[in-house]
A protein has these predicted regions:
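Active-site-proximal beta-alpha core segment in soluble small-molecule metabolic enzymes
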Residues: 1-50, 85
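Short connector loops at secondary-structure junctions
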Residues: 11-16, 47-54, 215, 219-228
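Glycine-rich beta-strand-to-loop/alpha-helix junction loops that act as flexible
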Residues: 16-18, 49-58, 89-94, 150-152
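Short glycine/threonine-rich loop-to-helix capping motif typified by GTGT followed
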Residues: 21-28, 58-70, 157-163, 240-245
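Short linear functional motifs in flexible/disordered or boundary regions
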Residues: 25, 44, 61-63, 85, ...
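Glycine/serine-rich loop-strand microenvironments at binding/catalytic pocket rims
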Residues: 40-51, 62, 93-104
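Active-site neighborhood of glycoside hydrolase catalytic domains
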Residues: 41, 73-77, 81
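Charged (often Lys/Glu-rich) extended helix/loop segments that serve as interaction or gating elements
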Residues: 72, 83-306
Length: 306
């Protein structure tokens, strides 16, 4: 850098960690600030620290729901309750002589600190090597620009992914499989499991009637089903965990996956077996009315905002 200082506009330092740990990020920030001092000593003029993204979101309203579900999954892995997943998929966990080993490989669907509160917690961390001052006060006192790259937290509670039910079949074990006109890649983030139950919108005829075989077979107890994609591959299970419904869906019904904007709806989408990637639609509310256009035709209307 020193040899090419005339060719470089040295802004500062950046990190982007694959972790949501506040403590690990605080260590990275402290390292950046120490590097700031080193750069200043070498007559550079750094002014920016970019701390990347990783600002968590909540996909569930109730923390206890998530704790109860993950506890039940672990019990199933240990064999103390019936399996809740396809072929007892353990999501990184295993049972060894009655003890649980490994880690639950999943994004936490509930967290007490998300979005802005997560950032505030990070900026409140104290650095012993820098006079025990907080990250925020050091940056403010030295006029250091803070750059962030939030991803899913910017679109929290937005976006839906809609698939149509093609058919309902039974596995060799007698488990209902709801086959959708989508594939796992259409609603998957780096092959992570999605633990939010979808919404079922039933198909009705022109008179609003709905008469199906599934309706006549509805049960008092919830029915456990698996959602499968259309690639004819066992790995193409949209959900590898069992989802419990009031009754079986029927062909033509719509299955709606909510809050899917943040990396889920098309992050891993592909054109497998020559299927085109699903079209995206932008929905806008103006003057109390909803309108929509194809996403590629959408133009933000900031100039119309007060």
């Amino acid at each position: 850098l020193e040899a090419n200082r005339k060719k470089i506009d040295f802004l500062g330092f950046s990190f982007h960690l694959d972790t949501v740990s506040v403590l690990e990020r605080a260590v990275a920030m402290e390292n950046c600030m120490e590097l700031f001092e080193e750069a200043l000593a070498r007559d550079f003029e750094p002014r920016v620290i970019n701390i990347g993204g990783g600002y968590k979101v909540n996909y569930l309203e109730n923390e206890q729901d998530w704790n109860d579900y993950t506890s039940a999954l672990k019990e199933a892995v240990l064999g103390t309750r019936p399996s809740m997943t396809w072929h007892n998929n353990a999501f990184g966990m295993s049972s060894d002589k009655g003890k649980l080993k490994g880690n639950f490989n999943s994004y936490s669907y509930f967290d007490t600190q998300t979005g802005g509160s997560f950032l505030q917690e990070l900026l409140s961390q104290r650095f012993p090597n820098l006079g025990d001052a907080t990250a925020g006060s050091i940056m403010q006192g030295n006029m250091i620009e803070l750059w962030i790259e939030p991803g899913r937290s910017l679109v929290d509670q937005t976006g839906i992914t809609v698939a149509r039910v093609n058919s309902v079949r039974m596995s060799s074990r007698g488990e209902p499989i709801v086959c959708l006109n989508m594939k796992r890649q259409d609603i998957s983030f780096l092959d992570q499991e999605i633990f939010v139950d979808p919404i079922i919108i039933e198909k009705h005829d022109e008179e609003g009637a709905r008469q199906t075989e599934q309706d006549s077979q509805s049960k008092e107890e919830p029915i456990g089903v698996y959602f499968a994609g259309n690639l004819c591959l066992e790995s193409d299970l949209v959900h590898r965990h069992m989802t419990y419904l009031d009754k079986l869906p029927s062909p033509g019904d719509l299955v709606v996956f909510v809050n899917s904007s943040g990396y889920f709806m098309d992050f891993s989408a592909s054109t497998s077996i020559m299927q085109p990637v699903a079209e995206k639609v932008a929905v806008m509310e103006r003057d109390g009315k909803f309108t929509w256009v194809m996403d590629k035709q959408y133009v933000p209307f900031w100039e119309c905002m007060p």
